[in-house]
Regions:
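Surface-exposed binding/hinge segments that line
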Residues: 89, 133-180
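Short, solvent-exposed loop/turn elements at domain surfaces
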Residues: 41-48, 73-76, 161-164, 212-213, ...
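Long beta-strand-rich cores associated with HINT superfamily self-processing modules
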Residues: 509-546
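N-terminal lobe/hinge region of extracytoplasmic solute-binding protein
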Residues: 36-92, 122, 194-198
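Active-site-proximal polar cores
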Residues: 502
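A short glycine/threonine-centered beta-strand motif
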Residues: 37, 61, 98-101, 155
């Protein structure tokens, strides 16, 4: 498999190249960006954030020690860029030393210190906070202040992703604010005055259910030309799209299905901008129950392989999600650094699928056309969440394809909380799911190995050979050798067919044409917003800073 490389600049609009942002007092290229968003964050405090919109907002207020460049591999130490730390060096195989940016200050004017870094790592590791990143920090990384501007990170074991673990998961918090508040009370703390970071934007106001506003911080150097960032909250994707179509918003992260994209494309005020997504979708089979009893139908690998052969994945992916959607080579998005691009997966071959079922004893009987093996019909259910019309469309398309193969398939649509409860309890035959990748391939361990049973591996797939390959790949320090091991693991999981890997999305954003210097980072689409500008000749009334 060929290792695909994503360019360091995720996407740059050709029409937006030119001069760098200015910071003069006149600021003719300054203004406001309004973002249409579906839903709103439950919190902005980074250790408690689980929604992508909360991350998008928080990452403009708070900073990491360093940033991974778009397209960079977590094992590549040259792919990291200074952020709150101006430099770092390796001390030994278990230790990294970071030097904080000279003059770094919190937005209330207090200096950022190594003590803040120590405090932040401790908070992320605390079971009381139970941050999403806690498994990567607790018992694995210890922060020690060497002086006020130098911090040493000590790791429990060697790993090629130490720099990634030291910088990607933790946003640095002000100890002088949060250290005085019991951690058990953090989630209930609603004091917006506590939302103080060291990043380029400061919190300004939040009208719950309506909007949230950030303002460029005067201490930032250079001060961003986009002086105000406003999120307009919509209850559903249609309402968010309407904010674009009525010109009330400048940006929409994901327009959606092809028919929706065509509506925006017809509006001359906006660019329609495709860029790779970190999302991949799949249909997962339940191979066994909690007691180890194989599923009467889907526990048979011949059935799973036949169902995979009978699914025209390229057609399904592009007809439902639009051009640019790929069929992944395994459980990964287009962005994961080990991705080999659009392979088409296992070839679409309905004749081969039928022969495979025949040879495994699943034969058509009677006038129904439904296959049976003994008294067991080839019958199962596909569970989908009501919150995703596209996943429902995927399930219905597969249902029809498998009906022609001789399978009796029912599609069950349930509310989101019920969907999650049934997955956790193992009360399903199969389900259409989607995962959001992070840059590291280690998420595969939680999703598809034996250690993920009771966690994200709802289908209870477990192959020691696959688990071993992932473990070896995660310990390998050489990028190419690591990728080769991951690819061998993908060949193994595809042969076992515990799931059908259906689509790796391409996002399509709506971007107002007056915006300049736009670069969209697929892992954090607003990360470069502090460097954006407004075309002076195209300024709108909302760009006024008065």
């Amino acid at each position: 498999m060929r290792l695909r490389h994503i360019a360091p600049v995720a996407l740059a609009l050709a029409a937006c190249t030119g001069r760098e942002p200015r910071s003069s007092s006149a600021c003719s290229d300054c203004g406001t960006v309004v973002i249409a968003a579906t839903g709103e964050p439950s919190t902005l405090l980074p250790p408690l954030v689980f929604e992508t919109i909360g991350r998008d907002v928080g990452d403009l207020i708070y900073e990491r020690l360093a940033d991974l460049a778009p397209g960079g591999a977590p094992v590549d130490t040259a792919a990291f860029r200074p952020r709150l730390a101006s430099s770092w060096e390796r001390v030994d195989s278990l230790t990294l030393r970071f030097h904080l940016r000279p003059g770094a200050r919190w937005q209330d004017g207090r200096p950022v210190t190594a003590g803040d870094v120590v405090f932040s790592f401790d908070a992320y590791a605390d079971s009381v906070i139970d941050a999403g990143a806690r498994p990567y920090i607790a018992g694995r990384i210890k922060a020690v202040a060497e002086d006020s501007a130098t911090v040493r990170l000590q790791f429990a074991e060697p790993s090629p992703e130490q720099l990634y673990d030291a910088t990607y998961h933790v946003r640095i918090l002000p100890a002088h604010i949060w250290g005085a508040i019991p951690r058990a009370s953090w989630a209930a703390d609603t004091a917006t005055a506590h939302l103080i970071g060291s990043g380029p934007y400061r919190f300004r106001r939040w009208e719950h259910g309506q909007s949230l506003e950030l303002a460029a911080d005067s201490l930032a150097s250079p001060m961003p030309a986009i002086r105000r960032v406003i999120w307009r909250f919509a209850p559903d994707p249609d309402a968010a799209l309407n904010l674009i179509l009525t010109h009330e918003a400048d940006l929409l992260e994901q327009i959606g299905t092809p028919d929706r994209v065509s509506r925006v494309a017809g509006d001359k005020a906006y660019w329609v901008v495709p860029y790779p997504s970190a999302v991949f979708g799949f249909l997962s089979f339940r191979l066994s129950d909690a007691n180890g009893r194989p599923h009467p139908v889907l526990g048979d690998p011949a059935v799973r392989r036949a169902l995979t052969l009978a699914a025209d994945r390229p057609l399904l992916a592009r007809s439902i999600f639009g051009p640019g959607t790929q069929v992944p080579t395994g459980p990964m998005s287009q962005l994961l650094w080990i991705s080999a691009g659009d392979s088409g997966g296992t070839a679409y071959d309905t004749l081969a699928a039928a022969r495979l079922l025949d040879s495994a004893g699943w034969v058509r009987q009677g006038n129904t056309g439904i296959r049976r093996r003994g008294s067991q019909p080839l019958r199962f259910d596909v569970l989908v969440p009501a919150t995703s019309s596209t996943r429902r469309n995927v399930a219905v398309a597969l249902q029809e394809a498998w009906r022609r193969l001789g399978a009796d398939v029912n599609v069950t649509v349930v509310d989101g909380p019920v969907f999650q409860e049934r997955l956790g309890a193992g009360r399903f035959d199969s389900y259409v799911g989607a995962y959001l990748d992070e840059p590291s391939a280690r998420g595969l361990v939680d999703q598809w190995t034996r250690s993920g049973w009771g966690g994200l591996n709802y289908g209870r797939y477990g192959n020691p050979a696959f688990d071993s390959l992932l473990s070896r790949a995660g310990r390998e320090t050489d990028r190419q050798r690591s990728a080769a091991l991951y690819h061998e693991a993908m060949d193994t999981i595809n042969a076992d067919a515990p799931a059908i890997f259906l689509y790796a999305l391409t996002n399509t954003a709506a971007v107002h044409r007056r915006l300049r210097h736009i670069v969209l980072d697929p892992f954090s689409w607003l990360a470069t917003l502090p460097r954006w500008t407004i075309a002076p000749e195209a300024r709108l009334p909302r760009d006024s800073l008065r």
